[in-house]
């Protein structure tokens, strides 16, 4: 009897075997309903079908129901998901279900759902409306129904309610019916509807190069300075793709930040543009997903998880702001959407465009190795003038709310000229260091030349590279000052302390806390554009693609947090943030200014960025990473473990380290650091520790991990901790 090997959404790296009853057939990629646990049925996805099982056949339960006649995934997405589960060492069931809309996970049909509507019956058309005058809601409802059908999901917006319609139904005056939406083929009347901008020479060259390779895999880095017209290149490439009857996937870092982008695509093309993001309800998400799969959607714009959308005939993938860290999932299945998008493009044999003003070092490394091709856009639209740059030395300055006196003076000047000011504060990813405010001394580990991380709760300094520790000094060993401060300031604290400095000036704080509610970001941005807010306080969210014509002063307040972080990636993140931020000032014919506050104005990173630009920084950083044998020249895997008592996690990781180093696959090129506390050592009441594995060969490191995972359950403490694997981590 055939055996179905079924993936279930459980945290176990295996499939489960079920018998297929006589007469029941199923294909890999189809959903089934199966018994699981005590008196419980679950939805599963068939990974394969065979005639054998590791268990005796008489011990296997049978599949209850097959939900699909054809796989819910296209062939290319199926291959992508199976490969990704293996590469990221994540349970196959969790991976497959992550890629499905919630309603499909729950067993809903993978087809356009019938759309229900109310209509007036023959009796309802003939009855005297005055007979309902004692029930005004019913009278209103029937009068409306006589004008035509009313869709069920529209009732909530009307003057009457569902109860009135149900009452009319009991009287035989109205009823419910349904119809399945017909497929509409946009290809029959496709045309470019919006206004085309004339491409400059660089843009035209880029579009032509990509078009010439349209029928095979090619990866293109579109490196364009802020305001150089990358979106116009995307639009022109999509014109060519849609003209061939193919579809396009456009991925963006934060869907809430790009209402302008969506509008530009919808205005440009006389074809359906669907949007996939976390703000959609379940029905909207399923509808967009199905339209992409059946070819009804010409363009899908979405965030990270949109990568797994099935397409009938995909012709190109665009990754906008490809350097953005939000493409990396940080919880659960820790995949990187940019990297998987390249795999998908290769599998589908189509071009992929990676666009950025500040490309990731991994992407630039692939360009150096001839895996990707480089296209440059160097001219800003309208020949806008670059912002004037200032570095303010904070040493010995009496700061207010984290602002130097010179910055406060500049802010007043710009505000008096009826302009707007942005203050950037970006703690995320920058580990706190200990700094002397008077002389600029930074607490540094003597064993490995990295900066100590300040642990406030334990009141000690700890090196996250070699694990050496020391108490927090009472005074600066360089100048004797007792003014030792942790680097960093919070946006909320800044907002509160700015108010008395600028009385009567409207202040708007834009960060994760203030924009979590649906529509909150759009509302705040509209207020900014109306001039309702004069001072904007924000994190890196504000650096992503917004155009603020009245912003003429931009200041970065916590530069030192990036310069002296324990995370080797923080310099790259800061360089990207600074370059993006500098493009926010003075974009509408007004001269812009950018101010950086630091205790170390002579720092080489600042000097390179200010006077040579991001490209020079990236070249220098890649050379340094190569010399230090850090990614992208080597591969990293982090194993994190956590517990409630701060005992089992480090013990488990030490046992795991011993297991790895004793493996016959481990060679002299494998480097293992730890166990050390995670950069955020305590979260949610749990203590977090980690070990880092590094190897110059990605393939070899994968083999080592595979061999280790097969034996991990032999470690005594493995069941006393929660542990996760992070392949190609982007945070220390």
From Swiss-Prot:
Modulation of this protein's activity: Helicase activity is inhibited by ATP-gamma-S or ADP. ATPase activity is stimulated by binding to DNA. Helicase activity is stimulated by SSB. Helicase activity on branched substrates is stimulated by PriB; SSB increases stimulation. PriA catalyzed duplex DNA winding is inhibited by CGS 15943 (CHEBI:131351).
Residues engaged in binding ATP: 224-231
Q: What is the effect of changing residue 445 to G?
A: Normal ATPase activity, loss of helicase activity, 5-fold less primer synthesis
Does Hydrolase appear among the keywords?
yes
Question: What chemistry does it catalyse, as a reaction equation?
Answer: Couples ATP hydrolysis with the unwinding of duplex DNA by translocating in the 3'-5' direction; ATP + H2O = ADP + phosphate + H(+)
Q: Where is this region: WH?
A: 115-174
Question: Mind telling me which InterPro entries this protein's record contains?
Answer: DEAD/DEAH_box_helicase_dom, Helicase_ATP-bd, Helicase_C-like, P-loop_NTPase, PriA, PriA-like_WH, PriA_3primeBD, PriA_3primeBD_sf
**Expression induction or repression:** Induced by hydroxyurea.
Can you name one GO molecular function term for this protein? DNA binding
Instruction: Give the region (CRR) as residue ranges.
Output: 432-486
According to the UniProt record, where is the region Helicase lobe 2, N-terminus? 388-431
Binding positions (Zn(2+) 1): 436, 439, 476, 479
User: What result is annotated for mutating residue 230 to A?
Assistant: Loss of ATPase and helicase, allows assembly of primosome and replication of phiX174 DNA, complements a deletion
Q: Tell me the outcome of changing residue 557 to P.
A: In priA306 (srgA1); suppresses recG deletion, increased resistance to UV and gamma irradiation, assembles primosome, replicates ColE1 plasmids. Slightly reduced UV resistance and increased SOS induction
For the region CTD, give the residue spans: 633-732
Q: What is this protein called?
A: Replication restart protein PriA
Please name the source species.
Escherichia coli (strain K12)
């Amino acid at each position: 009897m055939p055996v179905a090997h079924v993936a279930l959404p459980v945290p176990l790296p295996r499939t489960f075997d079920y018998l297929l009853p006589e007469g029941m057939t199923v294909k890999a990629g189809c959903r089934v309903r199966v018994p699981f646990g005590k008196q419980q049925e679950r939805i599963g996805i068939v990974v394969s079908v065979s005639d054998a099982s590791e268990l005796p056949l008489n011990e296997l339960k049978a599949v209850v129901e097959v939900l699909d006649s054809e796989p819910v995934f296209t062939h290319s997405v199926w291959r992508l998901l199976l490969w990704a589960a293996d590469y990221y060492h994540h349970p196959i069931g969790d991976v497959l279900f992550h890629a499905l809309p919630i309603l499909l996970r729950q067993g809903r049909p993978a087809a356009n759902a019938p759309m229900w509507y109310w209509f007036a019956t023959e009796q309802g058309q003939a009855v005297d409306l005055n007979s309902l005058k004692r029930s005004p809601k019913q009278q209103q409802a029937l009068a409306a129904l006589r004008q035509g059908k009313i869709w069920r999901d529209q009732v909530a917006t009307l003057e009457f309610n569902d109860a009135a319609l149900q009452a009319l139904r009991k009287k035989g005056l109205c009823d419910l019916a349904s119809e399945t939406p017909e497929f509409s083929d946009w290809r029959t009347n496709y045309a470019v509807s919006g206004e085309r901008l004339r491409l400059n020479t660089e843009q035209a060259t880029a579009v032509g190069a990509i078009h010439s390779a349209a029928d095979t895999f090619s990866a293109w880095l579109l490196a364009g300075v802020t305001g150089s017209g990358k979106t116009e290149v995307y639009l022109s490439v999509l014109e060519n793709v849609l003209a061939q009857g193919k579809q396009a996937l456009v991925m963006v870092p934060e869907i809430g930040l790009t209402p302008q982008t969506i509008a530009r695509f919808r205005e440009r093309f006389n074809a359906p543009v669907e949007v996939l993001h976390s703000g959609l309800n379940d029905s909207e998400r399923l509808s967009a997903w199905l339209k992409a799969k059946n070819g009804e959607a010409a363009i899908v714009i979405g965030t990270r998880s949109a990568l797994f959308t099935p397409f009938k005939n995909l012709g190109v993938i665009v990754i906008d702001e490809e350097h953005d860290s939000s493409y990396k999932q940080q919880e659960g299945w820790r995949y990187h959407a940019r990297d998987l998008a390249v795999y998908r493009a290769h599998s589908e044999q189509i071009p992929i465009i990676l666009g950025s003003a500040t490309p990731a070092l991994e992407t630039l490394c692939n360009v150096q190795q001839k895996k990707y091709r480089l296209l440059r856009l160097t001219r800003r639209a309208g020949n806008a003038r670059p912002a004037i740059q200032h570095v303010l030395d904070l040493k010995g300055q009496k700061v207010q709310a984290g602002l130097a006196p010179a910055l406060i003076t500049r802010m007043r000047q710009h505000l008096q000229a009826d302009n707007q000011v942005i203050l950037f504060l970006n703690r995320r990813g920058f580990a706190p260091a200990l700094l002397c405010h008077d002389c600029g001394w930074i607490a540094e580990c003597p064993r490995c030349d990295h900066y100590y991380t300040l642990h406030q709760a334990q009141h000690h300094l700890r090196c996250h590279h070699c694990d050496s520790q020391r108490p927090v000094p009472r005074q600066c060993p360089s100048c004797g000052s007792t003014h030792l401060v942790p680097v960093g300031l919070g946006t909320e604290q800044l907002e509160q302390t700015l108010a008395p400095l600028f009385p009567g000036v409207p202040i708007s704080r834009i960060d994760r806390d203030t924009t979590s509610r649906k529509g909150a970001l759009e509302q705040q941005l509209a207020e900014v554009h109306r001039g309702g807010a004069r001072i904007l306080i924000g994190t890196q969210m504000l650096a992503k693609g917004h155009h603020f014509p009245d912003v003429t002063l931009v200041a970065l307040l916590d530069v030192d947090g990036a310069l002296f972080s324990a995370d080797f990636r923080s310099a790259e993140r800061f360089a990207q943030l600074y370059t993006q931020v500098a493009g926010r000032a003075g974009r509408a014919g007004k001269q812009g200014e950018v101010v950086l506050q630091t205790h170390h104005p002579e720092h080489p990173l600042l000097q390179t960025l200010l006077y040579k630009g991001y490209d020079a920084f990236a070249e220098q950083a890649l050379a340094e990473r190569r010399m230090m044998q850090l990614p992208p020249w080597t591969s990293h895997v982090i194993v994190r473990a956590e517990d409630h008592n701060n005992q089992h996690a480090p013990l488990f990781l030490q046992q795991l380290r011993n297991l790895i180093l004793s493996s016959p696959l481990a060679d002299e090129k494998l480097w293992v650091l730890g166990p050390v506390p995670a950069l955020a050592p305590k979260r949610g009441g749990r203590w977090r520790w980690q070990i880092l594995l590094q190897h110059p060969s990605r393939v070899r490191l994968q083999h080592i991990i595979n061999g280790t995972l097969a034996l991990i359950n032999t470690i005594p403490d493995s069941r006393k901790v929660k542990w996760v694997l992070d392949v190609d981590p982007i945070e220390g």
